[in-house]
Amino acid sequence: MITKQSSNALRKKRHLRLRKIVSGTSQRPRLNVFRSNKFLYVQIIDDTKQTTLCSANSKEANVWGSNIKAAEAVGALIAKKALSQGIKNVVFDRSGYFYHGKIKALADACRKSGLHF
């Protein structure tokens, strides 16, 4: 019997395909996004040193939830933290999520706040 894979399993497959291509360096670290049912989490990662340079989430941005307003607030917050550490250029890793809705709002807010990708 043919069974349908869950959407999260398909997302993980897409994420693994993307991770073969996308990697962060010290000059251009990776902006990683994780979307749970309740919150949004964003990290800026240097893959060569395997360290997290800075992070933000929707709990920290005082906008509880995982909607578009929260995504915009988290995007502005992570851009502010990155620019304070001298990070201007990043590689956007959408973690297999479609570039639509919350993910697009987060990316647009990061760009509007001064990050380049």
From Swiss-Prot:
InterPro entries on file: Ribosomal_uL18_bac-type, Ribosomal_uL18_bac/euk
Keywords from the UniProt entry: Ribonucleoprotein, Ribosomal protein, RNA-binding, rRNA-binding
Gene3D superfamilies: 3.30.420.100
Biological processes, Gene Ontology terms: translation
Any one annotated GO CC term: cytosolic large ribosomal subunit
Keyword Ribonucleoprotein recorded: yes
Pfam families (alphabetical): Ribosomal_L18p
GO molecular function, a single term: 5S rRNA binding
HAMAP family named among the record's database cross-references: Ribosomal_uL18_B (MF_01337_B)
Subunit comment: Part of the 50S ribosomal subunit; part of the 5S rRNA/L5/L18/L25 subcomplex. Contacts the 5S and 23S rRNAs.
Family of the protein in this entry: Belongs to the universal ribosomal protein uL18 family.
Function: This is one of the proteins that bind and probably mediate the attachment of the 5S RNA into the large ribosomal subunit, where it forms part of the central protuberance.
Protein name: Large ribosomal subunit protein uL18
Organism from which the protein derives: Aster yellows witches'-broom phytoplasma (strain AYWB)
